[in-house]
């Protein structure tokens, strides 16, 4: 029986951290890790979309994970996204992730080419085989990856005993229920996890059965998601929904900027906590002077929402 309690709760997707020259900042990574530990989150999801994984080299992704683990080991659940645009690099990252002691590895499906399900299953299983003592999380994000997780593919992957979870970032919450049912059928009640992915519907996802959430805006306002999660655990749905509405309005505001959402969030973390995390890597657009009032208003909205808790 797997210990899935370590995956139940609020798990921020970890932001890419750069220095002034645009190189990986190990100090920034460590500072953000310490910050999230202090905030009381359950874990971190390293090297995913928020970590700008597809814009980083294999060695950079290893360096980020090593810096996270130097601070987080024994304190946070660490899930390392190891998917790359080819199997060899993905396998290398999977092997490295196991060597540094992560709790689980994860991967999106292969991107760009629309491959048959048996090829996707092999891609994932090859990574899992490279980290045989580490649990595996399927990352379903069809709107970006171009390929969605089907029930037949999930059932095939559940033949691998290391597959313990789906991180579901598709928009229909029904997918959470369907993936949960398939996991229970294969593993039994309490032995399979589904994470809610879309931050804007954390409450909806949790209510329909998600065990926790992994999200790209959690790190900039973890207090809100932790409070939502606590209210849901207590059955206080109206209170959770009110906080969800606040979080959603903040997300909408941040998305008004010319600069990418991650650039906005890292700037807010710098202003609120002095965390120097850098910008975003091109071709993602960085902040421009006209974004200043948007950043300032979003920060004020976060501070006001936290003050209401």
Which residues are covered by each model-predicted region?
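Active-site beta->alpha loop and helix N-cap motifs at the rims of alpha/beta catalytic domains
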Residues: 2-148
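Catalytic cores of TIM-barrel enzymes
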Residues: 2-6, 186-192, 269
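C-terminal alpha-helical cap/extension of soluble enzyme domains
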Residues: 6-15, 39, 210, 217, ...
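A general structural signal for well-ordered alpha-helical segments in protein cores
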Residues: 29, 61, 65, 90, ...
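Alpha-helical structural signal in soluble globular domains
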Residues: 39, 63, 67-72, 96, ...
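Short secondary-structure transition/capping segments
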Residues: 56-59, 117-120, 150, 178-179, ...
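Secondary-structure boundary/capping positions in well-ordered alpha/beta enzyme cores
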Residues: 75-76, 134-135, 161-164, 276
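Catalytic alpha/beta core domains of metabolic enzymes, predominantly
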Residues: 130, 142-248, 258
């Amino acid at each position: 029986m797997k210990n899935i309690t370590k995956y139940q709760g609020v798990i921020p997707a970890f932001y890419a951290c750069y220095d002034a020259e645009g190189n990986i900042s190990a100090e920034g990574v460590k500072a953000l890790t310490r910050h999230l530990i202090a905030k009381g989150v359950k874990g971190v999801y390293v090297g995913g979309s928020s970590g700008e994984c597809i814009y980083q080299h294999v060695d950079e992704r290893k360096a980020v994970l090593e810096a996270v683990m130097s601070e987080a080991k024994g304190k946070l659940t660490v899930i390392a996204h190891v998917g790359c645009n080819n199997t060899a690099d993905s396998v290398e990252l999977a092997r490295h992730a196991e060597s540094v002691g992560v709790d689980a590895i994860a991967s999106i499906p292969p991107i760009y080419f629309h491959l048959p399900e048996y090829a996707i299953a092999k891609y994932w299983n090859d990574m899992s085989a490279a980290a045989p003592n580490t649990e595996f999380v399927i990352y379903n994000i069809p709107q970006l990856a171009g390929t969605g997780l089907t029930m037949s593919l999930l059932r095939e992957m559940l033949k691998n005993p290391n597959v313990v979870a789906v991180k579901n970032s598709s928009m229909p919450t029904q997918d959470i229920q369907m993936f949960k049912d398939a996991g229970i059928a294969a593993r039994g009640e309490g032995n399979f996890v589904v994470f809610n992915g879309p931050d804007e519907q954390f409450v909806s996802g949790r209510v329909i059965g998600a065990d926790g959430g992994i999200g790209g805006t959690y790190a900039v306002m973890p207090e809100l998601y932790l409070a939502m999660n606590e209210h849901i655990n207590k059955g206080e749905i109206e209170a959770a929904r009110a906080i969800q509405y606040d979080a959603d309005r903040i997300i909408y505001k941040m998305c008004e900027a010319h600069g990418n959402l991650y650039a906005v969030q890292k700037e807010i973390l710098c202003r609120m906590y002095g965390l120097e995390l850098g910008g975003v890597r091109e071709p993602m657009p960085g902040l421009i002077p006209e974004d200043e009032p948007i950043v300032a208003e979003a920060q004020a909205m976060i501070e006001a929402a936290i003050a209401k808790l």
